[in-house]
Amino acid sequence: MGERVRWKQPELTSRGIDQTRLVIDADNESPGPEDAFHFLVLGDSGTGRHRFHSPPRQIAERLLTHKSQAAFLLHTGDVVYLVGAADQYRDNFLRPFREWLRDGEQWESMSHKNLVFNQPFLPVPGNHDYYDLSLPVALIAGLTLPLRRHLQWFHDVDAGWRGSGQGEVYSNAFIDGLNQLHSTKLSEHLETHYDAHWDGSRCLRYKPGQNTRLPNRYYRFRHAGVDVFAIDSNTLITPLGETQDGPSLQRDLRELEAKQRST
């Protein structure tokens, strides 16, 4: 994933860009630290293929009644079942959550790549978004797919020829893939979209309806004085010891813990 976002490459570090933060542009003034606000949260929003109804759509319909009052929606992972493949996005994400997508009424012809949301929709990848199929499983799933569709089983194993490409499909849908930009376009892109400022660093500006890419597979944003951390726990490993950002992150953690104790 680091290659996809050009992690800490000179073009970004020389501009002081923090690739783990984003600032959300809001239509109205953000509420203050003492003000209440609402947000939506969901996870594991999929299943295998159902013939007569769509569990993801039923979830989305329950959330729709609260959409207009919510500041943002957090998705805690397993965005697209069963294996996060590109051909599963239409029925398992685009169709169910079309009201959150710009031009969502055109979901049938919409690509899963470079999605744009009309309201902050902030996911992290789950294990299903990283799934890949071994060759034997892919062959069995692919060869039996026409038969399974013909039989119209009530509940089917939603798998075909492909998996997620080790999260590549998720990345194409939600993450700002800087590796896809030619070097001549990269500078313009960074100046246009990484123009927000946070504690002395530049970061990605999230603009609903325009640019709703995420800077990384894990990230942080702030709303009404509340810091929200989105962590991809699929790839957690033993810490490598001291890092350049370690002291500042430890300081931020101590400050947050102190605030919690004082409230």
How would you label these PLM feature ranges?
Residues 47, 80-81, 129, 227:
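Short active-site segment of divalent metal-dependent hydrolases/proteases
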Residues 46, 78-83, 242-245:
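Second-shell loop/turn segments in exported
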Residues 45, 73-76, 230-241:
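Short glycine/proline-rich turn/loop motifs
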Residues 218-220, 228-230, 255:
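Conserved hydrophobic/aromatic beta-strand scaffold that supports enzyme active sites
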